[in-house]
Amino acid sequence: MASPGEEVTSDESGEESNAMNLMEFSDEILLHILRYTPVSDLVLNVRRVCRKLSVLSLDKSLTHAVTLHKDYQVDKDKVKQLMREIGKEIQELNMSGCYWLPGSTIDQVTRCRNLVKLNLSGCNLTSLRLSKMLSALQHLRSLAIDVNPGFDASHLSSECKATLSRVLELKQTLYTPSYGVVPCCTSLEKLLLYFEILDRSREGLIISGQLMVGESNVPHYQNLRVFYARLAPGPVNQEVVRLYLAVLSDRTPEKLHAFLISAPGGFPQSCAVKNLLDSMARNVTLDALQLPGSWMNGSSLLQRLKFSNPVYFSFSRCSLSGSQLVQRVLNGGKDLRSLVSLNLSGCVHCLSPDSTLRKAEDEIDSSIAETLVASCCHLRHLNLSCAHHHSSEDLGRHLCQLLAHLKCLLSLALPVCSIADVSPVPADKPSVQPATNATSPSFGKKVRIGVQTYPRNCLEQGNSRPQPSVFWTLLESLPFLQQLELIGSSFSSAMPRNEPAIRNSLPPCGRAQHVGDAEVAAIGQLAFLQSLTLAQLPNILTGSGLVHIGAQCQHLRTLSLANLGMMGKVMYMPALVDMLKHCRCLRDLRLEQPYFNANAQFFQALSHCSSLQRLCIISRSGSLQPDAVMAFMTACLEVIMCHMFTGESLTVCKTLQQSLIKSFQASRPALNVVIFPLLHEDLTEVIRDVPMMHLDEITLFKSRVAEEPPNLWG
């Protein structure tokens, strides 16, 4: 702007006249923009900007569905104000994972009398509080809750039971042996059950899976269309789920089209379950199936079940041979365009014709992979992890080359050994591997401390494409991939579920030694990548590929790195530090690496990740610098979860944990801090107090691609 007395040039005046105020946009455009703003911000902040935004912020198209899930800055006062302002307008409310809100705040949901869909998973909820709430929500049709110790269905009022009788969709997470509210939901069409019951109470008492079964406690499954059960490890969870299934086996619902049970380890099949599966084979047609491996191994069930336009299959950890996959699942190679998601994790024989004679180091039958790709051409989610899938040297028959035809893939999980390019390199062509990777993996290359060992101009080099490997070609063919997992076939996390930390790990597959920094750099092609997992890549020497990913994958939100390079040294630390400086959108970071030194340099680089919300470090014999952690938490205002399990002493861990809580709890209501020695005998007791949302999504390692059907719970 010109000051008084100055002439305004024509260029300046024209620039001002062409400038457009945001408020000059049409209401339709502004509403579209406001859809990307959390409703809590719209109601509590944006509407106060001006009169126009005050009206638009309360538009029913914006306020009918409210999500507080992962809105970590919302506190009890904001929730109360939000419910007072727009409670009557809300039809869908998602408060899942709001573990920090007190029960009195959850009571405010009663103001939303027009609610149709309510998600309170992970919230503080008693049977009395639930009864009072549901009594006021007569229009409710979809409900998600937790059932905690002390839950008593006899506390539910008749008005509450009347509401439950109209509920069509129920998601129930069980922390105690109970039917919960299932017997009251007489019109259920979709039932999702998550069994998280521990075998022992806090006092050390053994928990029994027996339930008081009476006439009024029997679930009603006659209208059921979708049944899903996910079990945490432990015999009690198996015992309780059998009671749910026993009722289902008496009369199989005619409309059942999705039957899914996810159970780790061995899960013996009972007589009731066998009767249920036999009944399903006779009476229902499915479009989604997942069963424990022990129920399918050696069974003719797949041959007898009927499918119609299937959208999801999970045969995780089944001894399914390639011949069975082609004949029984892929219907002899016929069109399966309807299939959206396929989980073959842990199916070690699924790409080989015969499972009886195959050894881990044997090569796959590429014709089976070719049939899979041709039949399921619209696959969006594919998991082939936890197995050895070794390709032959035949030209054009590598697994990566075949998977490149799945142009619709959004998420992909592969074992590290499956992407190894073992074809001989002609003498006139340069090797794909960097020169540093030529070092024998058995001997560590000496590294000068404080000196970068990866090329300083690696980002410039990234613009000049190297001789393409089969993995490079695969990713080049999947430009819209959003989630990628490369997991060593013998990798196991040092922190398993409900057990002491694992002190030793299995050696990586020999073929994984062919996968190094160049293959990791290829991931930088994925411009839309949001989630990346790299686990057990022994030939990562400098980590130069990580820098390329950080610079190129600007949408990366979740990063999990585990056991990269040699176990005795963290040689990729300089590259990791440079990578983190580029990760502006990163929200979740999980690092699992023995001897990892979480020092000031690391945390200073991590401070560049301004969007970071959750951090988990797991390091056997690792160390940390408390002052650096405090400085990092001060700089990164969005961080609400800090989990560190290292080799530090209990005294150091407790002192740091208390300091973090004291300094930041008041300003960050959702703050969850756990600093604890990894190999301490009380680790499992500490873990049980971690909110399930954090434990399941980041602290515990697992493959997440095709873990559940897409949109299982909207």
What label would you give each PLM region?
Residues D27, L42-K60:
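Short helix-loop-helix/strand-helix junction enriched in hydrophobic and basic residues
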Residues V55, T67-N119, C123:
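F-box-proximal linker/hinge
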Residues K117, S121-T126, M133-A136, L140-V147:
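Alpha-helical bundle protein-protein interaction modules that mediate dimerization/oligomerization
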